[in-house]
Amino acid sequence: YEDLYTIAEGQIKGEESIINSMMHPKPSTLNPQPSSLNPQPVFIDTDLSVIKVWSEFVFNKCDNSILTQIANRTYHLYLLCNIDLPWVKDELREYPDLESREKLYHYYKDFLINQHFPWVEISGNYEERLQKGIDAVNQFILPQRR
């Protein structure tokens, strides 16, 4: 539990580094005059909400410093993946049982319902999920670029 804030700090530094490099790119031969007038979207697979949910799921609590950081950060769109695909083992995944997966999914959904930013549930087979994700991102970024 004590390591979670250290992990959260690393997450914040990583996000800020990526966003800063996108907003202030270095000149190159292909792009001699970088501009932040039309920045590209940044996709973040894991953010502080994942640390919060995991902490609450495993330890039944979350460090207040993490909650404060969540309240102070802004994200424009979340894609919440449903658990309707079979579980596939890899070195980062835990909880192969359906009951735990359902419980975690509801933790994430409850978190998103109680936030003030848009989110889209992604479900279906792999192709349907990809298309839903593309559609959700396009609906968000295309009106901003007009």
Locations of the language-model features?
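Surface-exposed helix-capping loop/turn segments at secondary-structure junctions
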Residues: I19-P25, H116-I122, R145
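C-terminal alpha-helix
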Residues: D135-P143
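A glycine- and Lys/Arg-enriched "phosphate-lid" helix/loop adjacent to the NTP-binding pocket
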Residues: W54-Y126, D135
